[in-house]
Structures are given as structure tokens and as C-alpha cells.
Amino acid sequence: MTAPDTDREEFVSLAGDADGPVVTHLVADLDVSVDPLAAYTTLADRSDYGFLLESAEKVSSSNPQGAFSAPATAADSHARFSFVGYDPEAVVTVGPDGVDVTDLGGPAAEFVGAGDGDVLDSLRGALPDLPRVNFPETDRQTLTGGLVGFLAYEAVYDLWLDEVGRERPDTDDPDAEFVLTTRTLSFDHREDAVRLVCTPVVSPDDDPGEVYDGVVAEAERVAEKLRAADDPAPGGFERTGEDAGSREEYEAAVRKTKEHVRDGDIYQGVISRTRKLRGQVDPVGLYASLREVNPSPYMFLLRHGDRRVVGASPETLVSVRGDRVVVNPIAGTCQRGSGPVEDRRLAGELLADAKERAEHTMLVDLGRNDVRRVSTPGSVRVEDFMSIIKYSHVQHIESTVSGTLDADADAFDATRATFPAGTLTGAPKVRAMEIIDDLEAEPRGVYGGGVGYYSWTGDADVAIVIRTATVDSGGADDAITVRAGAGIVADSDPTAEYEETEQKMGGVLDAVRRIEYGTEEASQ
């Protein structure tokens, strides 16, 4: 029998003493060895909703040759865990017409609320505010159920732009969509362990013993499935069309943004562009290819009906662990070198570039101001200022800003304070967003938004959606959308900014080419 970490008698006593409904916590070690992607395809990809969250270890300029370690061997605190979520109990969709809750079955779904206010108030209301029983007090590094999903960029109209008279674009896409998960596989790469983390809701009319027995049965069922799981055999991509957008229109938008900078409207504006591919694609194959060519701190594969969100983002939008809140500004980009010598030279030139340093410093200051809004006075700190971090196709200047979360604030307040990231808008934020609204021809969708989770514990970890493809199926062809932007300042060169967007899309497009042509042809 696969026994949870708490024995049956103790669990029955703890859950049975509650006066009302409670959310409980049980963990079972499954004693299996399986790759997270194989677990995802076995448990999550055969239904309409599921997720895979992974992370690779950052490599700084102290290791100039490498980019990132593979997720299966990463051992630092961020890259230690991977998560697979399957069979969620509800889907929470927030759009301009309000909140829609889809009950997928399970006792937690009846406690999902709608929350009054903006999109983040709605998400707060959707996470049942129930007393917690048997939750760990110290280990806050793992996802313990809750809301997992995405916050689209268009949420800015609800959060910010409505106040200045801007209307949300006409799009059917939601501002946010999250699943309520009570079953999560946690892969601890440091301990080489796979655990089933269950957070069942127990009401006074429920028999806690039956709930406990159900978790035991679920752990045994999942372990049996995972022992029989085959490594995924990802499919490829058969291209039928492509639209890279107009280079001339993008460079014209860059020139217009420069005029706004010179007129004093903004210090910087981030203008993005889209590539759209059409054809038949296997999203699992695309994710497998992306995590091989561009391993990153935040790798994710979300299945939401006919949409998959496939990404490898380097940048934290906001992270909350207990009372610690963190953002991770990234600004300043150059390509990777052909070898360690050229790599170091390019990184040195990037750090010596006055324009890049000024842009980065401005966005760090913006991050400090954002964090300060929800932090106790005097607690905000800048850490790891201007480190060079290397990725498969580019090198970035990165910094970390942290603060102590105010006692009256929570993870949703921290998201409101930091969303959208200044590295995806420019500064000042609201005026920069107005200019984006004027100059970008179509809605951004998930690009520039966030992907991550809000846990039952109050913790959260949300990545900025960049280096990401959305795959929309349901028609004759699948549609793959990839988007990237560049930070525009007074002396920006439109041609160079266009090329920067190409570099930033390079990892995702390389992953597409690899499943389209094969590894050998894609590398030529």
C-alpha cells in the first residue's frame, strides 16, 4: 500500500475536529521513476485541462560556456521541483463579462467564489478561503494545490487602462483562466522522489476516513499508471503557412515610440510583434523540443481545452514565499557567442553599453517602486544587481528586487502591484501601456501576461509570459503564435530593435524547426 505521510487515525482526528469545511493536506511517496513529461502525457494530456511546470537552474557569468542545466538534474532551490497537475476540480475564467466557473467535479468546486472587483479580486474569490488542516509549516518550496493558469496581458485594461478611458480590444480571449487543482505530482529532483500531493476538501458531512482511503487508492492508481508509462513519442509539425508581420510597420512603430520618448511622454516603451505559423503540430513535441533547446527557470505546458500554452520564460513576474516578495527585472540583451571567448566579449560589451545600463537601471527602479507598494517600509532590497545570465540564444542583464510583504497584503495584491512587468511595457507604465494600445495592431493575448500558481498556503510563483508559443487547435489547421518585443529609448535603431525581436523569438522558432525538420536539419 502507498501510505500518505500522515497516518489514518491522526488524519481522521484532525479533519474530524473541524467545525466546518476545511482543506486538508496529504502527501504520498509513489516510489516510481518517471520523467515529468511522461507523467504529464500519461495523466494530464488526455483530458481538457492539465499542466506541467518545470524549472532549470540559472547559470551566471561565472560559467561563461553553459546556458542552463537540464531540469532533471537541477538542485538549486528554484529548479528543485517539477509539477504535473491533472483532473482539476474547477476552471475559473475571468473576462470582461465577469467570472465563469466550470465545475469539473469534486467537493472543492462548490466552494469556488466569484469575488467582487477586478480580475485579481475575482481570482482571490475563486480560491476557497477555507481553514487549512495538516499543512506543513516550514517547507514552502512546493506547490500544495490551488489555482494554476494564466493571466493575459489584456487584464491591464481592467487593472489600469479603464481609469484613463481606454477600451479593451475586441477579443474572445479571457483576461485570466486558472484551474483549481487538488491533485499534483511533485518531482523532487534533489531527492529523486515523486510524490502525490493531495489537498482534498473535507466537509462536516464527509467521513474523513473515506477521504483518507480515497487518497490512498488514488496514490496506488497513479503509481501503477506511472510504472507502466512509456516515454512520450512526440510528433512533429507540418507547416501550411506563416505570417511574420510587416517589418516596415514594426520599424515605423519604433520610430513613433522614439518620438514619444523625445517628447517626454515616456522614458522607454516596449513594442512587440508576432509571428504566426499554421499547420498540424503536436504541442507535447513542441514543449519537449523547447525544453531541450532553451531550458529556462520557468518552463510550462498548460492545456486549456483547445489551447496549449508552451513556454520557457526566464523572468519572474512576482514570487511570494511567506512574507517575502520578489521580482526579477531583465533588460539588456545580446546574442550568444560561438564559443566562450566570444561569449565573454559580447557579455562585456553588453555591460559596458551605456544605453543598456541606463535602461536596466530604470527598470530596476520601477521594480523597486512596484515591490515597495506592498512591502513594509525600509524592507525593499536590490540583489544580484546586473548579473549576466545566459540562455540558448541570448544573454541578458538581470537583477533581483525583494521586499517583506506587508501584513495587510497577499499574493494577489503583490501581483496587482507588479503587473504588468515594466520590462514588457516601459516606463512610466500607464502612459507606456497607452502607447502600446495605440501602436500595436492586435491584442497581445498571453504574451506579456503571467503563468503560474496561487497556492492554498498563500504563496505564489508567477512568470512573465515571454519565449512562449500558444497553440490553438480545433480548426482545419493548428495556429502557433509567437511574440516578442524590444525596449525602445531615444537612441534606438529601428533595424536593430527588429533584429532583437527575432533573437528573442529564436529559441521558440528553433524548437518549432526541430520538430518540423528534425535536429540535424534545424541546426544547419
UniProtKB/Swiss-Prot annotation:
The gene is trpE. Its EC number is 4.1.3.27. It holds the Pfam family Anth_synt_I_N. Binds 1 Mg(2+) ion per subunit. InterPro entries: ADC_synthase, Anth_synth_I-like, Anth_synth_I_N, Anthranilate_synth_I_arc_typ, Chorismate_C. Part of a heterotetrameric complex that catalyzes the two-step biosynthesis of anthranilate, an intermediate in the biosynthesis of L-tryptophan. In the first step, the glutamine-binding beta subunit (TrpG) of anthranilate synthase (AS) provides the glutamine amidotransferase activity which generates ammonia as a substrate that, along with chorismate, is used in the second step, catalyzed by the large alpha subunit of AS (TrpE) to produce anthranilate. In the absence of TrpG, TrpE can synthesize anthranilate directly from chorismate and high concentrations of ammonia. GO terms for biological process: L-tryptophan biosynthetic process. Chorismate binds at residues 332-333, 447, 467, 485-487. GO terms for molecular function: anthranilate synthase activity; metal ion binding. Keywords: Amino-acid biosynthesis, Aromatic amino acid biosynthesis, Lyase, Magnesium, Metal-binding, Tryptophan biosynthesis. L-tryptophan binds at residues 55, 297-299. Belongs to the anthranilate synthase component I family. Heterotetramer consisting of two non-identical subunits: a beta subunit (TrpG) and a large alpha subunit (TrpE). Its cofactor is Mg(2+). It catalyses: chorismate + L-glutamine = anthranilate + pyruvate + L-glutamate + H(+). Feedback inhibited by tryptophan. The keyword Metal-binding applies. Pathway: Amino-acid biosynthesis; L-tryptophan biosynthesis; L-tryptophan from chorismate: step 1/5. This is Anthranilate synthase component 1. Mg(2+) binds at residues 359, 500. NCBIfam families: TrpE-arch (TIGR01820). Gene3D superfamilies: Anthranilate synthase.
